[in-house]
Amino acid sequence: MTEGKWAIAHIYSSFNNTLITITDLTGAETIAKISGGMVVKAARDESSPYTAMQMAMQVAEQAKAKGIVGVHVKVRAPGGNKQRSPGPGAQAAIRALARAGLRIGRIEDVTPIPHDGTKPKGGKRGRRV
């Protein structure tokens, strides 16, 4: 794992959009970043797995051009008061990064989890289905 430069791929995936940012190992310098809206025109397609795949391919090309050989992946969902499961684009993005020729180090879930934060929406009796 020592040969070549490694980076961190931050993948934020919700049901509305997917964002991929590649930074150096400290997280200070941004190497490449992209969002669903930069790839597709329709807002409904921003979170789709196909869009995430296209985004990952573009970001991987930019990273490889700057000498990155592998990435550690940090997957994040909206978290907090919102859903804690990543959207449909997360898994597709990780697969596409691997297929684009980048080595995958460790995959980590960094979804923010509240330690009894704000009140969830839905009122006193919750969401009645």
From Swiss-Prot:
Recorded GO CC terms: ribonucleoprotein complex; ribosome
Gene3D superfamilies cross-referenced by the UniProt entry: Ribosomal protein S11 (3.30.420.80)
Keyword Protease: no
GO molecular function: rRNA binding; structural constituent of ribosome
Keyword Ribonucleoprotein tagged: yes
Biological processes annotated in GO: translation
Keywords: Ribonucleoprotein, Ribosomal protein, RNA-binding, rRNA-binding
Any Pfam family the entry gives: Ribosomal_S11
Domain of life: Archaea
InterPro entries: Ribosomal_uS11, Ribosomal_uS11_archaeal, Ribosomal_uS11_CS, Ribosomal_uS11_sf
Ranges for region Disordered: 108-129
Function: Located on the platform of the 30S subunit.
Entry similarity comment: Belongs to the universal ribosomal protein uS11 family.
Quaternary structure, from the entry: Part of the 30S ribosomal subunit.
Designated name of the protein: Small ribosomal subunit protein uS11
Naturally occurring in which organism (per UniProt): Methanothrix thermoacetophila (strain DSM 6194 / JCM 14653 / NBRC 101360 / PT) (Methanosaeta thermophila)
